[in-house]
C-alpha cells in the first residue's frame, strides 16, 4: 500500500471482482454516450468543444535522476536527467525521465490508426512526476505524483470507434514494475486501472506531424495541443522519434 502526493488516501489494488464491475460500468457509460451522440446528430445539432488550454509551455533539461523512492531497477532503466515541462507561469508542470534504451522492436503492428507500429506494447517509455494536477488526453484530472508511462494501443474492438484520431497512448501505471519491457495488453490495462476507472493517458501523435526546431523540444502543433518531441535509442542501435502530447485533449464524444 502506498500514497500519492496530493492525496491523504492510500492506494490499494482493486479486487478482480471490483475491476470487472468497473469494466461493466464503462461499457454502460459508453453505450449511453453513443446513444446520446446519435440522438444529437438526428436532431441536426453538432457537438462543440471549448478549448481550455491557453497556456504557453517551455522545456528545460534538469540534471538528476528520478525520485529515490523508486525501485532500483526503474532508476537504472531511465536517464539520469529529466525533460521538464514548464507552464505559462514558468513553474514546473511535469518531469519526464525517458528510457535510456528501449527494447528492439518486435512484431510490428501496421493496422490503420496505429502511428507507432514498431513500439512494443506495454514497454515503459518514461517515469513521470506531476508537480500539480493536470488534465490528460481525455480531459481527466490527474493528481500530482509519480507514475510509470507505458505504451498502449487503444483496443480495436469497436467500443472506441472514432473516439480519437490515433490509437497510440502513453498510459500511466503505478510506480512499481515486475517488468519494464514489453508486456500484454491486459496486464498493462490492469495496472492502469489500479489508478482510475479509465486509464490516465496522453496521446502519442505521429512524429512527422509535429514540427520542431530541435530535439528534445516542445511545440504547439494544433490550436489546443502541445507535444514533447524527442528521439529514444534502442538496444539494436536504432532509434525512434516520438511526439507525446502533454497538454490538450482529444475525445470525439
Residue ranges and their predicted role:
Residues 28-40:
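Bacterial N-terminal signal peptides
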Residues 5-6, 13-30:
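Bacterial N-terminal signal peptides that target proteins for export
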Residues 45-116, 172-253:
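Primarily secretory-pathway and cell-envelope proteins
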Residues 123-125, 142-144, 165-167:
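Extracytoplasmic
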Residues 118, 159-163:
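Short consensus segments that form the blades of beta-propeller domains
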Residues 110-114, 125-133:
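N-terminal post-signal-peptidase region of extra-cytosolic proteins
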Residues 145-152:
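A short tyrosine-centered beta-strand micro-motif
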